[in-house]
């Protein structure tokens, strides 16, 4: 190509230079065919090309002249230092030096990016720790200390200039303190008027008892408001600390993923290269980062295939047979020119896939339901199923439940752990308004690699797993979100299998059947009697059965979500490569 372009440029200056173009093109072709001989092959290609072209040259251009010119070029080529040729090769697309230069540039950018992300991770971690240190996120003061602070503010306004101050607070401190503390508790409970004995004793003990009681009643309102504000500030700081810690972990994991280094797997690289080349595939370079089962990570540089999909249809199926893992193309960056190389990443596909079905109905057959549901496929190889039931019915309940699921989705997609996500949502719901906003949450996190499921049930009804004729109940005890500011999430773990059915429902379905004393036994029996394995049909049949027991009435919002776990079948079957099968082992 370089010879043709050079000869073409010469022909622009003089038409007679077309002869040189032919010579350079033919010599370049021979040099390319003899590229394994490196400098010797290139020299031999030029000399042979000159001899062959010279035999067909015009009379005014003899063979001797062409041969002298070619030998001169060979001598200059020999005198040219190797580092100059290498530097020139770096500028020519398609050469191994150019590709190596690009790889080094990419690695440099990768390392710089990873270091910056890691620095941000350390900053967020430091900020998180600063919120948990003394002075920012202290433990709550004890009740006795709070009472002491309150009574101190009361005495400043009542006893500070009283002539009996010395007698009450020096000689009879315990008696005075107990009287004022008891009055405070009675006022707080609204039962002071029902305790005349305490009022009489206070009148005998204090000359300003009426003023003391009035000040306590007045100050108690501000005291309660101040306590509530302190609790909200403390909870806000806790949320910030947890969120900063979560963000720090996500960024730290991201930095580790960027900075992943190649493992010392040269033998496996050569075996894979040989197997692919024996099949007729040309592979320029291969890098293995991991052959760990379930976490295979391989990168290759392959010639541009003009959109024929050779990586997906041939290389990935061969790797599947060689490694004993289901391998697919994770990312593909095609070459920008026909003779270039494509950068392809291969990795393990998910071992399982989830097929879902949903049945949904609003109270009274309306259009707005207080129930919301969501199915979220996360980047970490997990699949989330969630149902949220807002308090009551109608638009307000729909807003509560949909807001809960929207927050959950956004937090989970960042990679933050589900327990931290739920605690954060609970704190946000309890802090964002003075209104009572409660909502339940039924969350199932399915690991698509090993079929392990974590159930997080916040005030929700039981779920069921149907495995053949067996029905398994999943239940946990947690209050609805938004009631209390801080709580521990009870996580239930269950191992699912292929062809298992997971059935989740809101309370409108679970507690919906009329004239049924034991909802759990009734639901397990109905699920066990189902004759279909289609998730959508199961959701529809359960919904229909519950509505039939109520003579067609829908007295509450109703939602059923059904998920079926199945083995993941690759799009392309594996291509046998018996010589190196299971080399990863």
Swiss-Prot record:
GO cellular component: plasma membrane
GO MF, one example: protein serine/threonine phosphatase activity
Intracellular or extracellular location(s): Cell membrane
Membrane topology label: Multi-pass membrane protein
Protein name per the record: Stage II sporulation protein E
Catalytic activity, reaction form: O-phospho-L-seryl-[protein] + H2O = L-seryl-[protein] + phosphate; O-phospho-L-threonyl-[protein] + H2O = L-threonyl-[protein] + phosphate
GO biological-process terms attached to the record: sporulation resulting in formation of a cellular spore
Occurrences of domain PPM-type phosphatase (ranges): 355-565
Keywords noted in UniProt: Cell membrane, Hydrolase, Membrane, Protein phosphatase, Sporulation, Transmembrane, Transmembrane helix
EC numbers on record: 3.1.3.16
TM spans (from-to): 40-57, 70-86
Top-rank taxon: Bacteria
Function of the protein: Normally needed for pro-sigma E processing during sporulation but can be bypassed in vegetative cells. Activates SpoIIAA by dephosphorylation.
């Amino acid at each position: 190509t370089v010879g043709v372009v050079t000869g073409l440029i010469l022909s622009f200056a003089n038409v007679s230079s077309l002869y040189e173009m032919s010579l350079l093109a033919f010599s370049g072709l021979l040099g390319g065919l003899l590229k394994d001989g490196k400098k010797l092959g290139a020299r031999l290609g030029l000399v042979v090309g000159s001899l062959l072209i010279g035999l067909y040259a015009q009379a005014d251009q003899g063979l001797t002249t062409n041969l002298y010119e070619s030998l001169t070029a060979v001598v200059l080529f020999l005198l040219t230092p190797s580092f100059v040729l290498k530097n020139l090769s770096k500028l020519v697309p398609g050469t191994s030096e150019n590709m190596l230069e690009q790889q080094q540039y990419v690695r440099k950018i990768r390392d710089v990016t990873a270091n910056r992300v890691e620095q941000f991770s350390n900053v967020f971690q430091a900020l998180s720790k600063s919120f948990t240190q003394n002075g920012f996120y202290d433990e709550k003061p004890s009740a006795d200390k709070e009472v002491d602070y309150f009574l101190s503010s009361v005495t400043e306004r009542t006893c500070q200039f009283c002539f009996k101050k010395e007698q009450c607070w020096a000689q009879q401190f315990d008696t005075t303190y107990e009287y004022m503390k008891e009055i405070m508790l009675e006022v707080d409970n609204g039962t002071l008027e029902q305790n005349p004995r305490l009022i009489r004793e206070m009148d005998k003990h204090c000359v300003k008892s009426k003023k003391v009681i009035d000040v306590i009643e007045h100050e108690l309102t501000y005291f309660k408001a101040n306590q509530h504000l302190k609790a909200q500030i403390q909870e806000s700081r806790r949320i910030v600390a947890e969120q900063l810690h979560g963000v720090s972990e996500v960024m730290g994991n991201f930095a580790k993923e960027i900075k992943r280094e190649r493992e010392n797997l040269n033998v496996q690289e050569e075996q894979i290269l040989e197997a692919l080349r024996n099949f007729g595939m040309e592979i320029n370079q291969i890098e293995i980062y991991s052959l760990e089962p379930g976490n295979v990570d391989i990168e290759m540089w392959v010639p541009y295939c003009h959109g024929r999909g050779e990586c997906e249809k041939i290389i990935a199926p061969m790797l599947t047979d060689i490694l004993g893992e289901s391998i697919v193309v994770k990312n593909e960056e095609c070459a920008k020119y026909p003779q270039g190389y494509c950068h392809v990443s291969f990795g393990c596909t998910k071992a399982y896939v989830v097929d879902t079905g949903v049945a949904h109905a609003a109270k009274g057959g309306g259009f707005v339901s207080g129930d919301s549901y969501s199915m979220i496929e996360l980047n970490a190889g997990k699949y989330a199923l969630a149902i949220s039931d807002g308090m009551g019915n109608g638009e307000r309940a729909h807003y509560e439940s949909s807001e809960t699921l929207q927050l959950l989705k956004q937090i989970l997609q960042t990679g933050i752990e589900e327990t931290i996500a739920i605690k954060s949502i609970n704190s946000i719901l309890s802090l964002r308004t003075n209104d009572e906003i409660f909502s339940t949450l039924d969350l199932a996190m399915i690991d698509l690699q090993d079929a392990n499921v974590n159930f997080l049930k916040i005030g929700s009804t039981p779920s069921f797993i149907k495995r053949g004729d067996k029905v398994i109940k999943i239940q946990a005890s947690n209050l609805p979100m938004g009631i209390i500011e801080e709580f521990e999430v009870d996580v239930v773990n269950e191992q699912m299998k292929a062809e298992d059915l997971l059935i989740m429902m809101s309370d409108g379905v679970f507690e919906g059947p009329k004239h049924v004393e034991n909802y759990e036994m009734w639901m397990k029996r109905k699920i066990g009697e189902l004759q279909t394995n289609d998730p959508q049909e199961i959701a529809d049949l359960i919904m229909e059965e519950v509505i039939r027991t109520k003579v067609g009435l829908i007295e509450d919002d109703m939602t059923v979500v059904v998920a079926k776990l199945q083995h993941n079948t690759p799009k392309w079957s594996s291509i046998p490569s018996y010589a190196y099968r299971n080399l990863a082992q």
